[in-house]
């Protein structure tokens, strides 16, 4: 079901963004609402974008990205989750999904790196705050099939940066 949703988004999202009266927009919104709802409802917390929402929650700790919408932070969080799955879970399919998703998000004007979130000048200490919040006890992040520490999450966040490294 997740692959169907992904494929629908890869196919229809460019047209859907341009024309909210199009059939592509209707298919995209239905796919997001219905498929995500069914998956989350049937599979529970283990079938949701667990790291993506944890990343969103962590990013809320930084005023510099308060202007970024919830869905934009979650979209960025999906890229982070795929990076975690690739590096910590040794998942080559996650690497392929990352390579497919990143250019689509970028073409839609959605954030794909820290700079896009307004965090071009983020410090390592600020990122540590984000990661500790995202990794706190009870976080959905811990539903992943491998352990994610704040340091591992910070590596994934910084690894998505397209420009300069994080300041000390």
Regions flagged by a language model, labelled:
Residues 1-107:
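Active-site segments that bind and position negatively charged phosphate/pyrophosphate groups
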Residues 90-168:
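C-terminal charged capping/lid subdomain of soluble metabolic enzymes
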């Amino acid at each position: 079901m997740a692959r169907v949703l992904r494929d629908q988004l890869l196919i229809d999202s460019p047209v859907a963004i341009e024309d909210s009266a199009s059939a592509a927009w209707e298919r995209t919104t239905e796919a997001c609402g219905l498929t995500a709802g069914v998956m989350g409802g049937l599979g529970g917390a283990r079938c949701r974008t667990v790291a993506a929402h944890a990343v969103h929650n962590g990013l809320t700790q930084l005023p510099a990205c308060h202007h970024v919408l919830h869905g934009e932070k979650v979209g960025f969080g999906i890229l982070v989750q795929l990076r975690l799955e690739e590096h910590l879970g040794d998942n080559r399919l996650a690497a392929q999904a990352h390579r497919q998703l990143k250019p689509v998000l970028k073409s839609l004007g959605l954030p794909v790196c820290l700079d896009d979130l307004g965090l071009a000048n983020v410090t390592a200490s600020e990122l540590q705050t984000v990661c500790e919040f995202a990794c706190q006890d009870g976080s959905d992040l811990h539903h992943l099939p491998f352990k994610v520490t704040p340091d591992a999450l910070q590596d994934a966040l910084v690894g998505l940066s397209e420009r300069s490294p994080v300041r000390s």
